[in-house]
């Protein structure tokens, strides 16, 4: 049960992170929509009549339409974003999600018997009935009349597309269908899954939609003030676990409804606010966004000042730099994790107080009828765009006095609790955690090492503020080192680690992935010549490293391999063997790095760092593993002469193009490779010598 909960939490983390990709598009869309609308605002035109010029107004219309089209197609963006996030960013998953979403929508429309006349008749009626119009069950999605599944439909098909990708991206098909093998198969299977999903949702979704509508009406209609308070508390409480993205998504994108001037239904607090901003009508939305501004712009920066003031005198300079950076980040952008995690683990009582104050902030903003939109977070940038530019309708100016009051509350409450309870906030620790001074280029290498190196990483990801890593053995993770490297906090849930590095988290993740893929070399492993050329560091010790023959047969030069990929040394230098037996043994002491799914090739790494590929036969990939038996697993340690693979040589001779087996050093770089043996060779005889 415990392991099941850990896996469930890990999946929730991945889904939460995946939702950030489409959400990250919204600030750009919001800026286009806001500025485009402002450029033909009557009040602004009164002060700047020159903006009434035809071309300026045309530009404003283009900007407004460009922003609006993003909000109109959020379900599609969520489908593609969810698929990309859960499939490791591979574009094929995004294409599969797009295809799947269109097919699912078309299937639901046909099964439910929805026509385009149903859509237009509702739109015409909505113009007459206004906001009293009944919630429609139908929608027009890219010209397809279908059920109104909103962003939930996008998330569902996006997750299914990602599952199809992860399951089938390396599938092998018979030779006559070879063109459709691998990643090309993913959109095809997703199409079939989408048809089934569309059929199921045709019957399941209507009662689910009724339930969501009833829940929305209950939360927003019965006691909205209490709902905003509870929303604020839960949203902040989920921040440490990285699950807040999942929680607020229904409130922002589904709950509530508004019929715009065109007669189209708009769902979700954030989307409704944008539609009302565009229509120029009084705001009724913003209840689930406005509450962030007082504590993000004023409260938390004041808390940072309190932490700085209570630090030991000899530590204030260091703490002051950290707190100033975190406070400015919170004030300007609304990214609060670097500051929140600085006291979350060392003084949880402060975070409890912060959570309660966040809930009251949402409540007070609602009671004062302050309604400000948001696309990114509640910082000063969003405050200008979605508050001050519409101050006459949003009551945005009230944020300033309320924010000042919250700044005073945060400062004095944090000061009191820190002193009264002797909390070990930054700068007050009994044992000082020394920061490790590393360069930007060295940081991802250091973080990777602190996570237990690449063999310990099962899944690597990141969102706006945190590095999310699923490890195989969390006992290998050096939490203290991560903090020394700049993580303001490290959260552990099962084997899921979250290191809070702030806005640079995604770049660290990108660089770590590049390192793990062998695309980035450590600065410590490179030297620069006087001519400015970069040389790879030595991969073997002085005296060279010997590679022994893994197969008995005839050793020949690579130029004799009837495949240009190998004969032209596109994959690296080495040698080839025409096998006489079907046994393959380890050519050195080291580790198994990779086993191809079709079992025809195996990648090894020696203790000296030599990476070797043994590719048995040519065009053996099409055999789909038939005739091959692998005797080891990935990440197994191996010793010289250990059996790695058994091959049915007669079967390979009959069904493959050739049995000749290239043995390639894939990371030789500028190293010198000397052939020690050609002609007849026995397993275990010296075959190659690698020298720097």
Swiss-Prot record:
Keyword set, alphabetical order: Cell membrane, Kinase, Membrane, Phosphotransferase system, Sugar transport, Transferase, Transmembrane, Transmembrane helix, Transport
Organism superkingdom: Bacteria
Expression induction: Up-regulated by the antiterminator protein GlcT.
GO molecular function, one term: D-glucose transmembrane transporter activity
Pfam family, any one: PTS_EIIC
GO biological process: D-glucose transmembrane transport; phosphoenolpyruvate-dependent sugar phosphotransferase system
Active site: residue positions: 463 (phosphocysteine intermediate), 615 (tele-phosphohistidine intermediate)
Regulation: Inhibited by methyl alpha-D-glucoside, methyl beta-D-glucoside, p-nitrophenyl alpha-D-glucoside, o-nitrophenyl beta-D-glucoside and salicin, but not by 2-deoxyglucose.
Segments traversing the membrane: 15-35, 84-104, 140-160, 185-205, 215-235, 287-307, 318-338, 344-364, 370-390, 398-418
EC number: 2.7.1.-
Domain PTS EIIB type-1 stretches: 441-522
Domain comment quoted from the record: The EIIC domain forms the PTS system translocation channel and contains the specific substrate-binding site.
Protein name: PTS system glucoside-specific EIICBA component
Species of the source: Staphylococcus carnosus (strain TM300)
Taxonomic lineage of the native organism: Bacteria, Bacillati, Bacillota, Bacilli, Bacillales
């Amino acid at each position: 049960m415990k392991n099941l909960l850990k896996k469930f939490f890990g999946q929730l983390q991945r889904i939460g992170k995946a939702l950030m990709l489409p959400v990250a598009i919204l600030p750009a869309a919001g800026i286009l929509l806001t500025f485009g609308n402002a450029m033909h605002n009557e009040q602004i035109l009164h002060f700047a009549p020159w903006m009434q010029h035809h071309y300026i107004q045309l530009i404003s219309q283009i900007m407004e339409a460009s922003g609006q089209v993003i909000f109109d197609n959020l379900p599609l963006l969520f489908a593609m974003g969810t698929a990309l996030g859960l499939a490791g960013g591979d574009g094929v998953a995004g294409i599969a999600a797009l295809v799947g979403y269109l097919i699912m929508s078309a299937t639901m429309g046909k099964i439910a018997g929805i026509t385009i006349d149903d859509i237009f008749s509702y739109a015409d009626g909505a113009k007459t009935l206004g906001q009293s119009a009944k919630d429609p069950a139908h929608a027009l999605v890219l010209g397809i009349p279908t059920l109104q599944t909103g962003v939930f439909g996008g998330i569902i098909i996006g997750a299914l597309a990602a599952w199809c990708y992860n399951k089938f991206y390396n599938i092998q098909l018979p030779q006559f269908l070879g063109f459709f093998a691998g990643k090309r198969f993913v959109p095809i299977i997703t199409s079939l899954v989408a048809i089934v999903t569309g059929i199921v949702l045709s019957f399941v979704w209507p009662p689910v939609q009724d339930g969501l509508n009833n829940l929305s009406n209950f939360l927003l209609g019965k006691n909205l003030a209490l709902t905003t308070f509870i929303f604020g508390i839960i949203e902040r409480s989920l921040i440490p676990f990285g699950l807040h993205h999942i929680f607020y998504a229904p409130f922002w994108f589904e709950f509530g409804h508004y019929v715009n001037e065109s007669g189209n239904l708009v769902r979700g607090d954030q989307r409704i606010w944008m539609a009302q901003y565009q229509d120029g009508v009084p705001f009724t939305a913003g209840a689930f966004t406005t509450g962030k501004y007082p504590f993000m712009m004023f409260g938390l920066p004041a808390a940072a000042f309190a932490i700085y003031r209570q630090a030991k005198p000899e530590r204030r300079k260091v703490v002051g730099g950290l707190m100033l950076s975190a406070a400015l980040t919170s004030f300007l952008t609304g990214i609060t994790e670097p500051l929140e995690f600085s006291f979350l683990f060392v003084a949880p009582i402060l975070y409890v107080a912060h959570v309660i104050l966040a809930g009251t902030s949402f409540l007070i903003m609602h009671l004062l009828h302050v309604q400000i939109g948001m696309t990114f977070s509640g910082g000063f940038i969003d405050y200008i765009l979605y508050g001050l530019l519409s101050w006459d309708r949003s009551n945005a100016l009230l944020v300033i006095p309320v924010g000042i009051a919250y700044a005073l509350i945060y400062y004095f409450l944090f000061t009191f609790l820190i002193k009264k309870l002797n909390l070990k906030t930054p700068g007050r620790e009994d044992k000082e955690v020394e920061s490790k001074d590393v360069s930007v280029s060295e940081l991802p290498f250091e973080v990777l090492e602190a996570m237990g190196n690449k063999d310990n990483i099962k899944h690597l990801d990141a969102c706006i503020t945190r590095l999310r890593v699923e490890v195989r053995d969390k006992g290998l993770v050096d939490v203290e080192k991560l903090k020394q490297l700049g993580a303001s906090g490290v959260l552990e849930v099962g084997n899921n680690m979250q290191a809070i590095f702030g806005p640079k988290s995604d770049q660290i993740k990108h660089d770590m992935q590049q390192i793990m893929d062998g695309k980035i070399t450590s600065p410590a492993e490179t030297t620069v010549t006087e001519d400015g050329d970069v040389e790879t560091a030595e991969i073997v010790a002085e005296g060279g490293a010997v590679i022994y023959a893994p197969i008995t047969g005839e050793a020949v030069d690579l130029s004799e391999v009837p495949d240009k990929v190998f004969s032209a040394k596109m994959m690296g230098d080495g040698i080839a063997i025409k096998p006489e037996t079907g046994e393959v043994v380890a050519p050195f002491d080291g580790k198994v790095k990779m086993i191809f799914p079709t079992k025809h090739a195996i990648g090894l790494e020696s203790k000296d760092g030599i990476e070797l590929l043994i590719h048995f036969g040519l065009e053996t990939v099409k055999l789909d593993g038939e005739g091959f038996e692998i005797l080891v697993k990935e990440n197994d340690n191996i010793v010289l002469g250990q059996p790695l693979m058994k091959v049915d040589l007669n079967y390979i001779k009959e069904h493959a193009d050739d049995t000749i087996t290239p043995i390639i050093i894939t990371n030789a770089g500028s190293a010198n490779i000397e052939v020690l043996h050609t002609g007849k060779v026995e397993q275990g005889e010296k075959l190659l010598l690698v020298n720097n």
